[in-house]
Amino acid sequence: MRDAVLPGGGWWHLGLHCRAWRVAQQRKRPAGRHGVAQILRGGCRPQRASATGGNVEAAPRIAMVAGETSGDMIAAPLITALRKRLPRASFVGIGGPRMQVAGMESWYPMETLAVRGYAEAVRSVPQILAIRRELARRLLASPPDLFVGVDAPDFNLGLEVRLRRAGIPVVHYVSPSLWAWRGERIHLVKRAVDKMLALFPFEQRIYEQAGIPVAYVGHPLADEIEPVPDREGAREQMRIKPEVPVIALLPGSRRGELEQHAGLFVETAKLVAGQVPGVRFLVPLTSRATRLQFEEAQYRHDARDLPLTILFGHAQVAMGAADVVLVASGTATLEAALLRRPMVITYRVPRLTWHLMWPRRRLPYVGLPNILTGEFVVPELLQDDATPANLAQALVNALRDKFVRERQ
């Protein structure tokens, strides 16, 4: 088990890194708030006639594919920004609810692509491959003026190779984690994209060294989240008194993640509730399916009386109101860091997936705050270390540390 208590000043250290990262984004990002949109509007290749016979600038048709909630969250503001600059643009492909609200026509349910790991993927491979074949057929039959693959590299890169070979300009938004594992994918990326849009500054160097056109555009969360989070406002919104200890539980957005984490998080909450009088738990979930999974876990683990509120979305409000966050590794760890919330990062996958993936890792940590700082500033309890007892102790320690600091 990794140390569950951070060394003195750990959270402050993370805060400094987050502040420095915000400044770096402001300095290096293309001019204007929507730098990504400007890059896309500028194009990757010489301007050409639209597939529909008109001028690309007049009415471009842009295809996009996002494969999970984090991609939906990142791509929706991009669509909004592009529509402001190109009012007649149309957007098609695969996207989630935010992208659809922003004006995209989604041809397939995004949730179908939201799988992670070998064991989970095996069950879904036939359906995912069928969708990719049909999507490629539709896009090649009626070529868009631009294709933007949003994360989801296992789905998008293969599709992008086919589209680029057919002369369709391709941009990939959100770099695959080449720096963490499967670095050999850089060769596939080189065949697949005209330009990579990187969220983090260290990723830009990787692509420049490989001769792949790249732009560091920053992470949209750094614009979205206020530099000084409003804890009191978040608590008022949740109708929680200032003195109540609150823990936000974020078990993930995929159904596969809930299969691994729902029971674990419920058992952890039960242990914490037995040690921290008056504690409240907030659980933001992204879909009815994941909400049902979590509620079923409450019943299975006899935890219906837990002081727990399930929210539909509102993850940032839940984390903003919390004293400590228990979070599955992913984009939510970056949100918690930008909100300056102490957190414990955890993750579980099926045992086969773990044994196949873990030996191929390049870094000793998985959480974005630790990757960005280059050291363990946030505790990670993964796989066999991710037990209810270990997680509960880490959360209780983090709560006690917070209250001690506030009294000093």
Predicted regions and their residues:
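An anion-binding loop in the catalytic cleft
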Residues: 1-53
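Nucleotide-activated sugar donor-binding and catalytic core shared by glycosyltransferases
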Residues: 52-408
